[in-house]
């Protein structure tokens, strides 16, 4: 993404410093603002949940934000195809079924080689991506995606390539929800509900990012921990020897039982339930949990994973874990879950204030 990425990084650094400054000021002032912290391992869907909150409670996206996301959508679309093509060559050793499409492969790969994947898709590039996406060899490589690192949004953007490449394209809310750029530092959304001011923070999910920020949030009202239950057969982007589900459970364990968060409510979003529902029919969760003896179906497998997370809570008498199965890209479903979460928080605040 070239200069687009570097500009985002510099702007992000300035924003991170401002947020940290405000957090420290809030702490000194003993602020009554309701602070929620989104945590989870990389690519679990935290940023998507935060964007949903922005759509539902914070007047959506500004024109400037929409323009920024346009470049990210272009990038995600080109990168998705390039990632599949590279995996076909280097990991899967799969050829294109139609050898005549090698020229189209070269067209798409050249966009990334030139650092132009954040630019508007030309008609030539769009046609090449759509043609490659229809190739049975590419489809087979997509089905084998757990063997390499491919974002969950790849299918969405490749399916929508023609629309995305149209002149005057403007990302809609769904495009923005699916768009993906790794969170570095802290991203914040503010909104007001029933006279309460909410501040929600998304902390970068990769290991290095988490270490930088966790100490800043010892006074948050609740932690929304997000785990991608569909990733039980995948490894980390930053460590390809570690199973993503196991990493998520280890992180949950450290947060749930941390001295920083002894009195903080824990809300667990078991995210990507739609992908889990599809995958469980093909891949058993014994991949991550050899002790699982239940059926290869959604209900039994999810119940088992819930129990695994519940067992990590070392203080169940004092700390309740509220669990929700979610699909972060489904606005209607997320709205119901977030409303339930916010109602719970409001009730707790009223109890603290002695009004219940």
Curated annotation (Swiss-Prot):
Residues covered by region (G4 motif): 267-274
SMART domains, sorted: G_alpha (SM00275)
InterPro entries (alphabetical): Gprotein_alpha_I, Gprotein_alpha_su, GproteinA_insert, P-loop_NTPase
Annotated compartments: Cell projection, Cilium; Cell projection, Dendrite
Residues holding GTP: 40-47, 177-183, 202-206, 271-274, 328
Lipid-linked residues (S-palmitoyl cysteine): 4
Covalent lipid sites (N-myristoyl glycine): 2
Annotated Pfam families: G-alpha
Region (G2 motif): 175-183
General function of this protein: Guanine nucleotide-binding proteins (G proteins) are involved as modulators or transducers in various transmembrane signaling systems. This specific G-alpha subunit plays an important role in olfaction and in cilia morphogenesis. Involved in chemotactic responses to attractants diacetyl, pyrazine, 2,4,5-trimethylthiazole, benzaldehyde, isoamyl alcohol, butanone and 2,3-pentanedione. Displays a redundant function with gpa-3 in chemotactic responses. Involved in avoidance responses to copper, sodium dodecyl sulfate and linoleic acid. Involved in osmotic avoidance and mechanosensory responses.
Protein name (Swiss-Prot/TrEMBL): Guanine nucleotide-binding protein alpha-17 subunit
């Amino acid at each position: 993404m070239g200069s687009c990425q570097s500009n985002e990084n510099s702007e992000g650094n300035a924003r991170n410093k401002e947020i940290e400054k405000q957090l420290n000021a809030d702490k000194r002032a003993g602020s009554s603002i309701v602070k929620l912290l989104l945590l989870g391992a990389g690519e679990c869907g935290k940023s998507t949940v935060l964007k949903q909150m922005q759509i539902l409670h914070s007047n959506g996206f500004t024109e400037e934000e929409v323009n920024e996301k346009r470049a990210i959508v272009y990038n995600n679309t080109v990168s998705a195809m390039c990632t599949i093509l590279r995996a076909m060559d280097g990991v899967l050793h799969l050829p294109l079924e139609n050898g005549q499409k090698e020229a189209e492969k070269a067209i798409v790969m050249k966009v990334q080689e030139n650092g132009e994947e954040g630019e508007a898709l030309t008609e030539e590039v769009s046609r090449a991506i759509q043609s490659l996406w229809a190739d049975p060899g590419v489809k087979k490589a997509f089905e084998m995606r757990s063997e390499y690192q491919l974002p969950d949004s790849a299918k969405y953007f490749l399916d929508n390539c023609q629309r995305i490449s149209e002149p005057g394209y403007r990302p809609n809310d769904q495009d923005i929800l699916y768009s993906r750029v790794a969170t570095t530092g802290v991203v914040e959304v503010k909104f007001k509900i029933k006279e309460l001011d909410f501040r929600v923070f998304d902390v970068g999910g990769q290991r290095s990012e988490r270490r930088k920020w966790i100490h800043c949030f010892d006074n948050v009202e609740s932690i929304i921990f997000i785990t991608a239950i569909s990733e039980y057969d995948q490894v980390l982007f930053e460590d390809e020897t570690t199973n993503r589900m196991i990493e998520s459970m280890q992180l949950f364990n450290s947060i749930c039982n941390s001295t920083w968060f002894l009195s903080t409510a824990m809300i667990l979003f078991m995210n990507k339930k739609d992908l889990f529902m599809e995958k469980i029919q093909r891949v058993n969760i014994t991949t991550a949990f050899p002790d699982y003896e239940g059926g290869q179906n959604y209900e039994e497998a999810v119940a088992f994973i819930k129990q695994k997370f519940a067992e990590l809570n070392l203080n169940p008498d004092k700390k309740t874990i509220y669990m929700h199965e979610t699909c972060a890209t489904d606005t209607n479903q997320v709205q119901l879950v977030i409303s339930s979460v916010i109602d719970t928080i409001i009730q707790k605040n009223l109890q603290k204030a002695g009004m219940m």
